[in-house]
Amino acid sequence: MGKPWFVYLVRAANGSLYCGISDDPQRRFAAHQKGQGARYFKTSPAQALVYVEQWPDKSAALRQERLVKRLRKSAKEALVASFGGLGEISPCGASADPPRLSAAP
């Protein structure tokens, strides 16, 4: 099995949530804070890494990222509220099928 990948949410200064994937979300967040990587943070700087979930590989993380990006903001906020912090990152995708998220219609 390869290196795990992570889906993460970062809160921007304007209150919005940015979703991305990385094999090292803390390093990626530090890059976002420096204005590197995503153009998203040019207008509203990255403030906090608020949600992280681990996936077994990049492909699974990409599939989950697409699902999370399609969620309404209220559903993303629910993910953030359910997150116990960086010490509580547990592997997702133990089964062949990732959890089903309901995307906004």
From Swiss-Prot:
Extent of the signal sequence: none
Protein name (database record): UPF0213 protein PP_0972
Domain GIY-YIG: 3-78
Region (Disordered): 85-105
Similarity annotation: Belongs to the UPF0213 family.
InterPro entries: GIY-YIG_endonuc, GIY-YIG_endonuc_sf, UPF0213_domain
Record-linked PANTHER family: UPF0213 PROTEIN YHBQ
